Amino acid sequence: GGEWHEVDWQTALEYVANGMKHIQEEHTGRGLGALLSPHSTLEELALATRLLRQMGSDNIDTRLRCADFSDQHGKIRWLGMPIAALNGLDRVLVVGSHLRKDHPLLAQRIRQAARHGAQIMALNEERFDWAMPMHASLEAPAVQWTLALAGIAAAVASERGIQPPVEAEFGLEATDIARALLNGANKAVLLGNAAVHHEQASALHALAQWIAKETGATLGFLGEAANTVGAQLVRAQPVADGLNAAEMLQGKVKGLLL
């Protein structure tokens, strides 16, 4: 034990299968867990999920970089619109993304929208070069993103004369973002990878959802991997009392399928 050996596929598969059966017999299926890549195909995710659940385990997850799992049982998170619809947006607020690096193809579509007059806005740790004109950019350390987004929500509430979801201070930049979103016709609030991986991701999600609702915008998730949405469709994450990725990595299972 403790050493890597190069073997043929049959030997490797039998070794893994026997190991999983042993853990199931000694600790029930709950002793098993699976950390699956969100880049995997739908078939791979579905088969792995089916295997674990038939062995009695709900310890399955693809959210390997997430830190906040408190709202994991919500609706499927996706872009919220067809990809082609990005070209037709006239207002876009991106939260927590180096758009040009993280999502170059989506960035190109938003860039096309900007060329046709769309106002692009961002909340990030720093002002990134997205190779497109920016209407407004709010920079804050990641630990302050919840306060910053709450400020944008408060600015929206102030413009509309309604109660904000939480009381928060806001400045001119937040006011510019709020007014732009309220005046647009086709608009979106998009959460990037850094927002989804944030330690207060659920709070950012709730605030973004409120802003989108009150401004008539579509809420979307840019998505970190090729099959993030597919993983949700086949329930490759805990649906009952299973452990999430962070809990499994803390050593709460006896064996992990990677």
For the regions a protein language model found, what residue spans apply to each?
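Catalytic alpha/large subunits of respiratory electron-transfer oxidoreductases
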Residues: G1-L258
